[in-house]
Amino acid sequence: MTKKRITFGLLVLMVCVILFVLYVQLRNKDSIPVQSSAIHPEEDRIFFIYSNPFIKESVLLSTSTGERFNRRTFKVADVPYIQTKSYASTDLVLLAEHEPFYYTLEKDVIKEHPLSDPFAFWYEGKDVTIEAYNVDTTGNEIHINDRKTKKEYTLTLPPLVTMGASDENFIYIIQSMSIYVIDRKTEEMIETLSLASYADQFADSEEFIVASSDHKLTVIEKGTWKTTYIAYPEDLEYADTVYYDKESGSFYVAYEDKEGGANLLEYGEDFSIHTYSLKFPYMEAKFKGNLLYIVAQEEHKKGIGGYVGVFDIHSKEMLYQFDLPEEQVKVQDFVVVDNK
């Protein structure tokens, strides 16, 4: 009898162990281990993602001023986009381009989160979430969660939506050569605003929307929806990131000139335009507060993967610069966070 009890007890214990192991495996199947150096949180302010759709290893690099880097590698391909989870968050999100997944960094693992379709973009505002999905080649599905009006709804727009934003009254979504305006109260699309040419980014103030369209700057007055197209400088090759600076009341556009150099266009409150050559190579730029961060890839110098220059948008002076280390894959995107 005692022997049977012991045998039964061991059997129950074994079953419990097996169930626990299965539970852990199921729970961790979406966790991808990260190999990293010692992490210094005070340095984790600028994050760079190196990735390639055909190589199953990406690198997440972080630093503060480029004096020292924290390096994380993980077995995931095709994550060319990095952003923070929301406008006020420091949590990082990595977005795949062709696969229905996004990834979050959690201590020593990268968490994989499945989606119904690949993201076109993900916007997390103060009281609005916009999730845009690449459903097929004929259109994008837009999911809107408006926490102010307590409404959730879905819209379908033509393909190539790239960015969304919101203010107290409206939601704005840019798609190729148009900006769609959605009334937050009625959930209706009230305007389709034509851009001067293709654009994938815009910025807005209380009064204006400014899109960095290819051939001319598009300026739209909110409410009246009056649109003005402003000629760029003759040396412009590619208009990129656009930003509204509340402190100065000016809009800024980072652009590449015909020689591959970085430039800054300032569109002032008085509708004046000034341009400044920053004497730095250009691939991509991000604004944060009164600072402009510019990244350029390096193709030929061994050991160097790229260059970073940090500029004050008011003085137009370079504050510092540093080299990025070379990796097996190229740097694709970066984000700047506030750890204050």
From Swiss-Prot:
GO cellular component annotations of the record: plasma membrane
Predominant place of localization: membrane
Bilayer topology annotation: Single-pass membrane protein
Keywords: Cell membrane, Membrane, Transmembrane, Transmembrane helix
Transmembrane segments: 6-26
Subcellular location: Cell membrane
Keyword Membrane: yes
UniProt name for this protein: Uncharacterized protein YeeG
